Amino acid sequence: MTATPETATNRGVQRLHAAFARAEAEGRAAFIPFMTGGYPDAARFGEVAGDLLARADIMEVGIPYSDPLGDGPTIQRASEQALAGGTSTRRTLELVRELRQKDDTPIVIMTYINPIYAVGPAEFMRLAQEAGVDGLILPDLPPDQDLEIADLAAQHGLAVTFLIAPTSTPERVKLVAEACTGFLYAVSVTGVTGAREGAALGEVPRMLDLARQYAQRPVVVGFGVKDAATAQQVAQVADGVVVGSAFINAVAAGRDVGALADELAAGCRR
């Protein structure tokens, strides 16, 4: 991947690609922790997300949403708790802005499409840009169905990422791979998010090989990564490892999130 000068319209893309390049140069996959915005509450979110951000190559923050079809019970409960505590879409972006003032690590927002439309696509992109967001992960937006979102994101310097799954056809993988500007997100299993017992690579190597035929983009893997051993498995084939539910479970149990992040980050070494 050839580097290009950073401009207002490719800032997020360049920052994300630089993060992957640094991780690769150090012999590891990028470590990408996830936390639901405003969980367990707005004040604690800043502490927890700060601990994760300090150890991350890229941080993923989820917009809490009342109908998260792709999320398992752990992230659903986190969203419900955050929403009950008053964390709206706008408030999540304010929390990201506060994180950005303390740390320059790239941050991507995972959001379903409805919260974007509730705020207004142009306004959402403006707020995300002002908060220091580098990219968007859009799990329920087919890349060929709403080009306005991708165009607005690009205009505001935000990379866009779409998902592929083990059930994705080669034609679908090609479409998604070519539409992604930041990185490609491969779902390791069919179903919803969540740390799983016995999670294995399954169809992931095939998916990644196929995706890399169509686009020179980093490919990350998520859904089911729960510990250092699982992370190490994924790191052998992916450019980045996403861990979400394991951290939310740790917060709920009162465990040391920083220590868990250290373990999982170490697991990303090849």
From Swiss-Prot:
Family: Belongs to the TrpA family.
Protein name: Tryptophan synthase alpha chain
Positions of disulphide bridges: none
Function: The alpha subunit is responsible for the aldol cleavage of indoleglycerol phosphate to indole and glyceraldehyde 3-phosphate.
PROSITE patterns (UniProt xref): TRP_SYNTHASE_ALPHA
Assembly and binders: Tetramer of two alpha and two beta chains.
One BP annotation, GO: L-tryptophan biosynthetic process
